[in-house]
UniProtKB/Swiss-Prot annotation:
Domain of life according to the entry: Bacteria
Protein name: Alanine racemase
SMART domains: Ala_racemase_C
Pathway recorded for this protein: Amino-acid biosynthesis; D-alanine biosynthesis; D-alanine from L-alanine: step 1/1
Name of the gene encoding the protein in the UniProt record: alr
Gene source species: Sodalis glossinidius (strain morsitans)
EC number(s) from the headed UniProt entry: 5.1.1.1
Amino acid sequence: MPRPIVAKVDSAVLASNLSIVRRHAPQAQVWSVVKANGYGHGLNTVWQGLQQTDGFALLDLHEAVVLREKGWRGPILLLEGFFQPADLAVIDRYRLTTVVHSDWQIEALRRMTPRAPLDIYLKLNSGMNRLGFSERALPGAWQSLNALKHVATLTLMSHFAYADMPEGVEGQMAVVARAGEGLTGPRCLANSAATLWHPATHGQWVRPGIILYGASPSGNWQDIAASGLRPVMTLQSELIAVQSVPAGGRIGYGGRHRVSETHRVGVVACGYADGYPRHAPTGTPILVDGVRTSTLGAVSMDMLMVDLQLCPKARIGSAVELWGDHVKIDEVAASAGTLGYELMSALAPRVTVQIR
């Protein structure tokens, strides 16, 4: 028998989450962001649930080719652009849309002769200070690209650093307004947080990522609890052993947790080598036999321990939900001092993914 841990991905929930995104941005088209192997859900899995999207956005040229070969004929956006001039031949062949964020990329485009004009997303650094042209340099970059006969639609793009925080988007939107003054063309600005909470940013295209998979861009599930968004992935396993630990007994590596009275402790077939956060402390929420309880002690490579005091019927073989509908991935991430983004994308290849 295989190890009982499995990640179940519900493509119907993915489609429902996309519909909710559309209700938040009814006038915009949607780039469904499927980078990092579909946020850990599996590109081959998630694209089936996102067939009604307007386009897919990702990083890897190979994954873009995979989508084309699977039959996707709509737009595909390369979020980091191309990494060397030779990539342009693949972009041309598979009719991909590329981000441009550096002068050398403009020069490479100038030198190429594509079979048909390409759609380009010109990236503005409006305050993230990661990729993109400065406010001062952007108009010149726009003019250079706009002068090329083999550039079709030129879209202004930027990325918000604080859309999920009190600072919001106002400062960066002011930069976008100044840099884009007089530049006619579509705008693509809104990430997940801006799609939900800043409608003035929506423009012609929005780029939802984490919310498609049913987690919060802020890391706080309560921020999206009323939205109708649901987790797409359920990571589940089983109890593979039950221990009766006497009063004073210590749990796991380093004995980080000591029980004050005789305690039933369950052992779950899941550890940090499966993608569960190693730094999740005692008290991290978990569901055992339909009852919400918590972890005990340090997470091991292949196993973790759970408190069964509230689960009197739990036994070997009882179902365990690590995260999903009942224990949100944001809750587990917050307990471990990280974000749902990291946990999703860190799901280990050894975990079987099932589509339902």
